[in-house]
Amino acid sequence: QCETPYFARRRKLIAAVLDVCLHGKSADLSPVEDGLWCICEETTWAISAHANLTAAHPFPISSEPILDLFAAQTAMVLSFTLTLLDDWLDSSLHQRVTAEIQRRAIDPFLHRNTDWWMGFTRKDLCNWTPWIVSNVMFSARCLTDDPLPVYRRACGMLDAYLRCIPADGGCDEGAAYWNMAAGSLLDCLELMAEAGLNCWDEPKLRNMLRFPLLMSLGNGYFANFADCDARPVMYGERLQRAGELLRDAPLTAMGQNLRGQPTDCIGDVPHFSRLLQ
């Protein structure tokens, strides 16, 4: 009941942004403005399942922002919106959105050590780490003059995540989780490549990026285990990019074959950065 309108609001915003990008002055900017303002007015950007609500404390606290998967992803969506429509948006709206991204995503990322997925208090990490880190990195890249403080802190978190991954690069949650595990790690590494990082020959990384290729049974079917479907939605554009960076022709071909429509990236979980790739 909570997640349906939550994700619908973000899908509508992305669609409205694309409408303005495609049609320019003939497009209606008000759905973008309304979407941005409504999201800024939300008490929390975390979904209810991640908000740590209890009978004693049934409401989120706005002064204690929760940085979960979708709070980070919301920050990314808003950051791309501000970047794409920088000249179109009123300066006061731009300032409000920027301040909310800073308060809810970038500041907690830089100054808090208690979130389990950061790897400071817990060692058994999962796709939460690269998923959140990648979206905060996108936000910092779009909105800050110097994203390097975020990138440096991201390196420590990603190192902790990589220590949890076996040498064979396997994902114990199944092939579908590659999208937001190794696929999100790929997002991080491409951003860091702007600062000179080159790690594409690292054996564990290569194995992680090639994992779906090993799980493929053909015709869109994958060996399924944990809670992974036998025919999962795979982000073909990320697989293709991984294949190109690794100079791996079979992986590149798999990505090309699995590329869907742009609207697939705003389906269940709106992902603006993947939509633009």
Predicted features by range, described:
Residues 7-22, 34-38, 72-84:
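Non-membrane alpha-helical segments in proteins
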Residues 10, 14, 30, 69-72, ...:
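Alpha-solenoid HEAT/ARM repeat scaffold
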Residues 15-16, 20, 136-137, 178-192:
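Alpha-helical scaffold elements that line and support the substrate/ligand-binding pocket
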Residues 18, 38-41, 45, 80-84, ...:
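Positions within ordered alpha-helical repeat solenoids
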Residues 20-33, 81-102, 140-155, 192-205, ...:
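Structural helix-adjacent loops and short alpha-helical linkers that scaffold large soluble proteins
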Residues 26-66, 73, 169-177:
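Helix-terminus loop motifs that line ligand-binding clefts
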Residues 58-176, 187, 271-276:
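Active-site lining segments of carbohydrate-active enzymes
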Residues 182-277:
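Carbohydrate-active enzyme catalytic cores, enriched for enzymes
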